[in-house]
């Protein structure tokens, strides 16, 4: 298990953290992802929870949040999540999901191919717009993916 904090370049990029969450969910122990670049970046966590991940929102104790966070701290909402704790290892299970956005879609897909059972994704154009031919590329690496056109 490991902890990461997102940062602006050259730090750990915020775009990596959803995919990283899927990977570290397989690790033994507890890991924390602390998001300091974007507000409300953990929408994907609910999908991973539905697939079996043990994820809980946490609020890190930060002495000077205006200096740590790269967004306007005064704009935050009570429902905003700034970090999650992932307790592993996780054995992801399948499900049916409508992909809400690019990063959540790639995260669900990664969890699905690393887990057990059948997963059905709709609204996959969200994934396609950022990952060209991802199904073919992952299939060439041994993933079992079948694209069905409606």
What are these regions (language model features)?
Residues 1-150:
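Short, structured segments at the rim of ligand-binding sites
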């Amino acid at each position: 298990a490991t902890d990461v904090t997102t940062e602006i370049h050259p730090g750990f990029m915020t775009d990596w953290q959803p995919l990283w969450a899927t990977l570290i969910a397989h690790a033994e122990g507890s890991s924390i992802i602390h998001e300091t670049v974007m507000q409300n970046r953990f929408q994907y966590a609910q999908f991973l929870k539905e697939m079996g991940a043990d994820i809980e929102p946490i609020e890190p104790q930060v002495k000077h949040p205006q200096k740590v966070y790269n967004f306007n701290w005064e704009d935050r909402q009570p429902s905003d999540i700034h970090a999650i704790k992932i307790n592993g290892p996780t054995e992801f299970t399948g499900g049916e999901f409508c992909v809400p956005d690019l990063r959540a879609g790639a995260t669900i897909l990664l969890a699905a191919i690393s887990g057990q059972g059948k997963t059905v994704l709709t609204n996959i154009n969200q994934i396609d717009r950022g990952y060209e031919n991802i199904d073919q590329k992952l299939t060439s690496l041994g993933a079992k993916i079948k694209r069905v056109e409606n």
